[in-house]
């Protein structure tokens, strides 16, 4: 098994006795810094991306990096990988000053970056990707037998049962990520940085990644872990450093004693209460009601209602049926029993288009795959639904109307984009989510179904999204929020429906909502 293999090698390399802490040397003293940054400054025209940043990472630790988008985390990784050259400051690796002119130079020195967008060649095989840059050859001819043998050995070390001759394009995201990790290990990288590695992984793939990272840590490697997710910091990190506006704000030396409110305050530059900014309101009549609804993912009939001006959270563990329920409400799946009522009238949707016409819209969990057309412009994405109102006979006028509509909502929702023609794929996750919301605002939607609306979005952008939800509720709209983030679902919801194994386990009023109460309802008996 991979983690056992890596741990065994790590114990031999580090010589650590039983009972030594992860950051301790064999004699119990703290391990020395493996990587040191001193006064690193990176500037671009008109922008100081990193401002005199100093940071140390120890061998045998997982060091978390947190901060909003634009805080400087990605620039720091690019300095480590040789993509960006600092204008000032020193980078030391094992006490020796280094300056990398290329990613190859950084990798040869022992630094590997596992980016969010994986850098593999889809058309090449697993073996070829693992060995890129060091393909075995005999007299200048590729030694395929040696290639496959070395790749097979590495896959076994990772615990991956993959045919090394498989083209990478046929692998899952989780499998591709393991190939990236394998590449780093084959080059004996002692510093490995992960950039938001779980953003596209399933729960099972995430669990497997965490086991690998724990094993790498036990092997004495220095791990840098960039994330937005507090639960990942709790599960993995020994220390965590917060960045804001290109500066290192603070390093928290013990995650076990971490003050979450203080950490989030460091990230956004204001108290945590301002992040959720909850404001109560008096709800109106029932807007949407499910009565005995059955369908894919639901083990028992589901019944609930939500009122105008109300924000209802849906919490549960993976497989609880929350996303499946949203798809039934949206017409993306057909119920096998029960029905939905909208404003007191029974409705039935043959497709999502029918739901939108009736006033129900969904912002999907997989924003990039189901919510946007990444290569299309912000304006095109914003107008995807509204175009059905425009007249084919008046194309020029309607093109003008589309641009006016896009400009209006870009301003109204403070969407950060160069202009309306910018490809939406170039925007941050928070701004992509705003474009999806703008699309439905242009449709005069009454019921908004939000499935994991802030996944992969930094804390500052989350606050803006939450404020949009409050504005919708203040205007009498109904917002249903599926969220796996306990603090979020408690912080923004008027009440919370807890689902478990395809059924509703209970409904909790805001005054009684606590992490313990929700978890107890969500856990299988």
Curated annotation (Swiss-Prot):
Does the record's keyword annotation contain Cell membrane?
yes
What is this enzyme's catalytic activity, as reactions?
Answer: L-arabinose(out) + ATP + H2O = L-arabinose(in) + ADP + phosphate + H(+)
EC numbers for this chain:
7.5.2.12
Q: Look up and give the membrane topology term.
A: Peripheral membrane protein
Write the record's keywords in alphabetical order, separated by commas: ATP-binding, Cell inner membrane, Cell membrane, Membrane, Nucleotide-binding, Repeat, Sugar transport, Translocase, Transport
At the top of the EC hierarchy, this enzyme's class is translocase
Q: Name one Pfam family in it.
A: ABC_tran
- Extract the ranges annotated as region (Disordered): 1-25
Q: Which Gene Ontology cellular component terms are annotated?
A: plasma membrane
- What residues does the ABC transporter domain cover? 35-270, 281-524
Q: Where is the composition biased (Low complexity)?
A: 7-25
Q: Which PANTHER family match?
A: ARABINOSE IMPORT ATP-BINDING PROTEIN ARAG, CARBOHYDRATE TRANSPORT ATP-BINDING PROTEIN MG119-RELATED
Listed under subunit, the entry gives:
The complex is composed of two ATP-binding proteins (AraG), two transmembrane proteins (AraH) and a solute-binding protein (AraF).
As for family, the record states: Belongs to the ABC transporter superfamily. Arabinose importer (TC 3.A.1.2.2) family.
| Full protein name | Arabinose import ATP-binding protein AraG 2
Species assigned in the record: Burkholderia thailandensis (strain ATCC 700388 / DSM 13276 / CCUG 48851 / CIP 106301 / E264)
Underlying gene? araG2
């Amino acid at each position: 098994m991979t983690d056992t293999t890596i741990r065994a090698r790590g114990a031999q390399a580090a010589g650590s006795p039983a009972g030594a802490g992860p950051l301790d040397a064999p004699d119990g003293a703290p391990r020395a810094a493996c990587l040191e940054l001193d006064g690193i400054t990176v500037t671009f025209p008109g922008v100081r991306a990193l401002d005199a940043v100093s940071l140390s990472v120890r061998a045998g630790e997982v060091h978390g990096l947190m901060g909003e988008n634009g805080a400087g985390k990605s620039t720091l990784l690019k300095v480590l990988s040789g993509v960006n050259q600092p204008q000032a400051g020193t980078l030391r690796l094992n006490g020796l000053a280094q300056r990398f002119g290329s990613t190859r130079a950084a990798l040869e020195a022992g630094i590997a970056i596992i980016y969010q967008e994986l850098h593999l060649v889809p058309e090449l095989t697993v073996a070829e990707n693992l060995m890129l840059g060091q393909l075995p050859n005999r007299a200048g001819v590729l030694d395929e037998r040696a290639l496959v043998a070395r790749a097979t050995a590495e896959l076994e070390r990772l615990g991956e049962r993959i045919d090394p001759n498989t083209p990478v394009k046929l692998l899952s995201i989780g499998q591709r990520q393991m190939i990236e990790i394998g590449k780093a290990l084959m080059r004996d990288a002692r510093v490995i940085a992960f950039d938001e590695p779980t953003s596209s992984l399933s729960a099972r793939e995430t669990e497997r990644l965490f086991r690998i990272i724990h094993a790498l840590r036990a092997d004495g490697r220095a791990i840098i872990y960039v994330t937005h997710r507090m639960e990942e910091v709790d599960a993995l990190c020994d220390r965590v450093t917060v960045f804001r506006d290109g500066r290192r704000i603070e390093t928290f030396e013990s995650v076990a004693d971490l003050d979450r409110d203080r950490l989030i305050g460091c990230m956004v530059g204001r108290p945590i209460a301002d992040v959720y900014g909850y404001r109560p309101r008096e709800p109106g009549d029932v807007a949407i009601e499910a009565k005995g609804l059955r369908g894919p993912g639901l083990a028992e009939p589901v019944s609930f209602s939500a009122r105008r001006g109300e924000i209802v959270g849906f919490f549960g563990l993976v497989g609880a049926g929350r996303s499946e329920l949203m798809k039934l409400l949206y017409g993306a799946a057909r119920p096998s029993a029960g029905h939905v009522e909208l404003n007191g009238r029974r409705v039935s949707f043959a497709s999502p288009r029918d739901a939108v016409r009736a006033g129900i819209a969904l912002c999907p969990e997989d924003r990039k795959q189901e919510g946007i057309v990444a290569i299309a412009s912000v304006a095109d994405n914003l107008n995807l639904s509204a175009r059905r109102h425009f007249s084919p006979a008046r194309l020029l006028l309607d093109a003008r109307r589309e641009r006016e509509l896009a400009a209006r909502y870009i301003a109204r929702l403070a969407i950060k984009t160069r202009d309306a023609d910018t490809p939406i794929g170039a925007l941050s996750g928070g701004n992509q989510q705003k474009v999806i919301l703008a699309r439905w605002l242009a449709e005069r939607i009454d019921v908004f179904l939000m499935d994991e609306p802030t996944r992969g979005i930094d804390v500052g952008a989350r606050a803006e999204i939450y404020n949009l939800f409050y504005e919708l509720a203040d205007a009498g709209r109904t917002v249903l929020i599926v969220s796996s983030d306990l603090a979020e679902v408690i912080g923004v919801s008027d009440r919370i429906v807890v689902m478990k194994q395809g059924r509703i386990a209970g409904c909790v009023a805001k005054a009684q909502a606590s992490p313990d109460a929700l978890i107890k309802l969500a856990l299988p008996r």
